[in-house]
């Protein structure tokens, strides 16, 4: 217990310096190269302390590692790393990060990076949030793309892993929107890590009917046109109904949509979504 307290107190009192600042001030030499992926520990950083004193180095969450090949993706660091490096010594670390240019190709093995820069605003916020609240790789990647490439928050799929719902709530609050009631699925593309080609939308809805009558449900698109009819008109009793929406949206344009629920041709409820 005594040793644990000493280590914690030392970490709390030690002042760490940004890896970028140390490199600019000629205190360290660094070389960055891809390990051949775009998620997790995917960039290797070789560091040499070229001073005569120990250095306390900080690789910050929110730092964007700049891929020197513009056709390949930059990497957004999502995990803080603080470490000491003695005088005239070398070390190697692996940066934990995710791609932040969804339309680019993934970095190839040994591709060179520069130390890049610290992001600001929403990208910095999501990096620091995921540093404190990590979830599964697919969810973290989707969350980064929401802010780096303006992807629909509904692209973040619910999973059984603890923390995903809290992440969706935090993102909705950050964007000042409601938590999407639906999820959007995208096609795979071997030429890029994210295709941006939506094909399916799923999610539960609930509606209430004050009395019996003839029920009909449609989806209207951005130009108010009918995009889909859920069922033929059916006679139903009054009450509360739950319905699992499952829409094929492959050819639908991006924009705002409404599910309209009618009873005896009278509009009873509208449910919004966007793709």
Language-model regions, residue ranges each:
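Short acidic, flexible loop segments centered on an aromatic residue
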Residues: 53-72, 216-223
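Short, surface-exposed loop/turn motifs with a glycine/proline- and acidic-biased composition
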Residues: 236-259
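Intrinsically disordered, low-complexity Pro/Gly/Ser/Thr-rich segments with frequent PxxP/GP/PP motifs
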Residues: 66-114, 225, 231-244
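Short, aromatic- and glycine-rich surface loops/edge beta-strands on solvent-exposed regions
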Residues: 217, 253-266
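Edge beta-strands of extracellular beta-sandwich domains
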Residues: 267-275
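Bacterial Sec-dependent N-terminal signal peptides
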Residues: 1-14
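Contiguous beta-strand segments within globular domains
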Residues: 40-42, 185-212, 242-244
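Asparagine-centered strand-capping/turn motif at beta-strand->loop junctions
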Residues: 41-54, 59
């Amino acid at each position: 217990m005594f040793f644990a307290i000493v280590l914690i107190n030392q970490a709390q009192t030690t002042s760490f310096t940004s890896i970028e600042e140390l490199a600019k001030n000629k205190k360290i030499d660094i070389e960055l190269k891809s390990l051949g992926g775009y998620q997790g520990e995917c960039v290797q950083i070789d560091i040499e302390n070229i001073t005569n004193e120990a250095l306390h180095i900080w690789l910050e969450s929110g730092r964007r590692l700049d891929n020197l090949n513009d056709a390949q993706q930059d990497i957004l660091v999502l995990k803080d790393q603080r470490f000491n490096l003695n005088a005239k010594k070398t070390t190697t670390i692996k940066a934990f990060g995710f791609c932040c240019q969804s339309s680019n190709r993934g970095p190839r093995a040994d591709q060179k990076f520069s130390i890049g820069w610290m992001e600001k605003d929403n990208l910095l916020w999501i990096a620091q949030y995921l540093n404190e609240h990590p979830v599964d790789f697919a969810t973290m990647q989707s969350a980064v793309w929401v802010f780096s490439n303006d992807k629909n928050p509904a692209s973040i799929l619910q999973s059984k892993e603890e923390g995903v719902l809290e992440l969706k709530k935090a993102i909705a609050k950050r964007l000042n929107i409601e938590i999407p009631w639906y999820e959007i699925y995208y096609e795979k593309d071997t030429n890029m890590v994210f295709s941006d080609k939506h094909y399916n939308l799923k999610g539960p809805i609930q509606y209430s009917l004050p009395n019996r009558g003839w029920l009909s449900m449609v989806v209207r698109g951005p130009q108010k046109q009918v995009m889909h009819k859920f069922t033929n008109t059916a006679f139903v009793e009054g009450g509360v109904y739950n319905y699992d929406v499952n829409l094929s949206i492959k050819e639908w344009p991006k924009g705002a949509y409404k599910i309209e629920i009618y009873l005896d041709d009278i509009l009873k409820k509208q449910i919004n979504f966007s793709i």
